[in-house]
Amino acid sequence: MRVVAKIGTSSITTDSGSVDRDAIVALCADVARLRRDGHDVVVVSSGAVAAGVPAVGLPSRPSDMETLQAVSAVGQARLMQVYNEVLEGHGLIGAQVLLDPHDFVDRTQYLHARQTLGRLLELGCVPVVNENDAIASTELRYGDNDRLAALLAHNLSADVLVLLTDLDGLHTADPRTDASASLVTRVAADDPLLAIATSSGGSGRGSGGMASKLSAARIASWSGVRTVIARASRDGVLVDAVAGTAVGTTFDAHDRRLPARKLWIAFAAEVGGRITVDDGARKAISTRSTSLLPAGVVSVTGEFENGSTVEVADQGGVVFARGMVAASASDLRGVVGRRTAELPAGMTHEVIHRDDLVVLPG
């Protein structure tokens, strides 16, 4: 099997923010056991910023971009040093792979990442992946590493995604504040994964919470990948999750896997704007998988160019689809509501072609 395992900042750092070597030792022991059993394992590890904070003498996590990026560069080196030392103790070679949003927005980079990671696995290495925070040109957090791990699971055609955290899994309420909260052990593939109310906040040392993990599970499910959310400190948690032993919360893989191109449009591409459509267009798109025509467009929000990815919403503001537009925002505003016969010469007859349009799952 091919496994993507993500461990969060709060699970591999101490309260002071330093790297918790024991946590990495436990994780790598599971990785080594899986490797001995013939499985490929990719680790997605948070913790660079948290590990860098005490190293540079700061009292707490900074909030400004420049300091966050600088601290990330310091912390990433320390984090990877620990991984390399521990993996070498098992006769394994760690390989640092840093990714940024461009690697999931640009199709060429997306495929290049797949080839590089695939080759590392062929060579017997254990890729340790993190977001390339130190040189991010926009927001430091591209979603979060939960989403990154889910996109990698799709990219690598993984069999299972394991999200390791400081909770036992998904609960009916936040167990840290509600004593009546109970563990949800399984979520079916046809269950709207994001409909369950969760606390979106993570720990003070990380950027992800349960809401981001549910979003990641949704991406993975529609990639045909089983997902498990479980407590990182549980003995043998990664091995048990891969084996299918009852641990944490399991999200079943959907039996209808979205093609790579459509999954990329739905979950990975940067959104440049929004197109609001009338009820007739929504019904045609949702039930008959038709293209979106200018006649069905009610309004255009944002500034985007031909080829950009946009949200498609109904008149109630509900986003139900995403797609790659065949014209710029300025051109589309000039043809809102027009029938094909009324379009100016040279104007595309399809705002979004059906092959570039994805009705969002759930």
Please tell me what each predicted stretch does.
Residues 1-61, 65-93, 97-362:
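C-terminal catalytic "cap/lid" subdomain
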